[in-house]
Every structure is written in C-alpha cells, then in structure tokens.
Amino acid sequence: MKNNRVTHIKLFSTNGAGVKNGKVASLNAEVQSTQSNIVTLQETHCTQKGKIKMDKTFVMFEAIRKRKGGGTLVAIHEDLNPKLIAEYDEEFELLVVEVDTADTSIRVISGYGPHKNWEEEKHLPFFIALETEIEKAELAGKSVLIELEANSKLGPNYISKDPHNITPNGTLLAGIIERHTLVVGNGSDRCVGTITRKKSNKK
C-alpha cells in the first residue's frame, strides 16, 4: 500500500473526442503542468486498452466500447491507492475507481452516456447504472466525484449561464442530482471557463 497521506486532490478532466497521436502528448503535458493526481477522459475512441500512455506513477483504468467511438478512462496517481470498483462497457461506458486520501475515501465515477438521438429505452440503463453506483458509495460511506459526458443539458436551473434548456437526458440526470443532493460543479461560482466550440444542428 502506498502512502495515503495525500491531503489534496487535483482533477483534470476532458472530453477527448478521440485521444491519440498528438493528443496523448498534450494530455501528459497538461497533467504535468497542472500537477493533477486524478485524470478522467470521456470519448477516448480507443479500440483496446493500453493505447494511452501516461507517467508510470499513474494507475490506469479503461472501459472500451465494443463498437466504434465512445470509451472512458480514469488515471489515478499511485499514492491515492486506487482500486477498481466497477466497469461497464456494453451499451455505454462507466468506471468507478476508489481512492484514499488522508481524511476520506472517494469513489471517482467517469462515464460516457447515451446520445440524445438514441431510442428512448436505450437511455435509461446508463442513468440506472450511475445511480446504482452512487447508492453503493453512499451505503459504503464513501464520497463521490462524478465526471461525465452524459450528453445531458441541465439548463439554467442548475448552471446559471447555460444557454440551453434542459433536455430529456438532462431531466434524468437532474433526478439523480436531486435524490442524492449532489452539487453540480459547473454551476458553482468557483467554475469559470470559455465556450470554445459551438455546434449548430440544422433542421
């Protein structure tokens, strides 16, 4: 067991939209620059595990989509004693990894959820699995830190500057937030950022 006197965690998370070639070098540079000890990636597009290489002090966990696209990765510095709790990789990708700090244990959840244009019945399994893992963490007395590409827009009720209205996926996610009294980081005053990409869906 590594020294678990780690008192602070620093998270680096992004939707990679395909993490390969130059993006891997950029990822490692960002992690080193920010001194992050937890990394989550959504939409890795990897077809097999082990393609994304990071510093050997990180323990890597991946869920790979059976068909093209998707995928999620969690990388944890070894000093946080990471251990895999759950991995889903059938119709969607979800990883649950537990870490230990000096004061508490946290379950880091990373996932890539259903597209809004999927059939309605294909949306529910992802959100059911997500809520199940939150409930398991609560029963075990663990905190949760959740980073998702859930293809869910929560709207201005949760994120004050969100220019979008809540979507059906967002409604499912909002139900989980309310039932478990979760805090939406993007809606916090501490969260700042710039929109770097906009997509127009023409009818």
Segments from the language model and where they lie:
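A shared catalytic/ligand-binding motif for oxyanion handling
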Residues: 1-203
